[in-house]
A protein has these predicted regions:
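C-terminal nucleotide
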Residues: 1-37, 60-72, 78-171
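Short glycine/serine/threonine-biased micro-segments
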Residues: 42-46, 73, 82
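DPxDG-like acidic metal-binding loop motif
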Residues: 42-63
């Protein structure tokens, strides 16, 4: 069940940490890991990425490398754990790039987070996404949409840009 999946995932992370940093657990006859979240896990707000980031940092490893080896994540979720503000992210397969950006449009009070109670499996969704061939012109278009969103002053323009973005990336 769900508890078994969590244990397997944690073991996968710890096994990779032990492989990269063999001295990590050498003085421990056993370890006890306790985590706490300030949000409902079912919301899908990056609980796995936060765990990977925190354990990686604790053991002196690069969280992007750990994530790449234990998940099929692009690294955007790891980048999001490092900065508590909006970011832009790209991954050219060599090294993830992320940067904090200013995004506080005049209509920000009209933007909402709506929980639909439809958490998806990140692993499955990433696998599905990786099978799609994305053309270079689509990447350029998405990048331009991102830049327009960051400069956007009107909510109607914002909504149009989000719809345009979704029409490109929707599966």
């Amino acid at each position: 069940g769900e508890k078994t999946k969590k244990k397997i995932f944690l073991k996968k992370i710890l096994d990779f940490i032990a492989k990269k940093n063999p001295k990590s657990f050498e003085n421990n006859s056993g370890i006890n890991i306790k985590t706490r979240m300030d949000f409902n896990r079912r919301w899908g707000l990056g609980s796995s990425a936060i765990l990977i980031n925190n354990l990686s940092n604790y053991y002196g490893l690069d969280p992007f490398e750990v994530s790449k080896n234990v998940t099929n994540s692009s690294g955007a979720d790891i980048a999001s754990t490092k900065i508590s503000k909006p970011i832009i992210f790209s991954n050219n397969e060599k090294k993830p790039y992320y940067k904090e950006v200013h995004f506080n449009p005049p209509f920000s009070k009209n933007l909402l987070f709506v929980y639909l109670n439809k958490k998806q499996s990140s692993e499955k969704e990433v696998e599905k996404f990786k099978k799609i061939r994305i053309e270079d012109d689509e990447i350029r278009t998405i990048s331009e949409i991102t830049n327009q969103v960051l400069r956007c002053k009107k909510i109607d323009d914002f909504n149009d840009l989000i719809e345009k973005h979704e029409s490109i990336i929707s599966l």
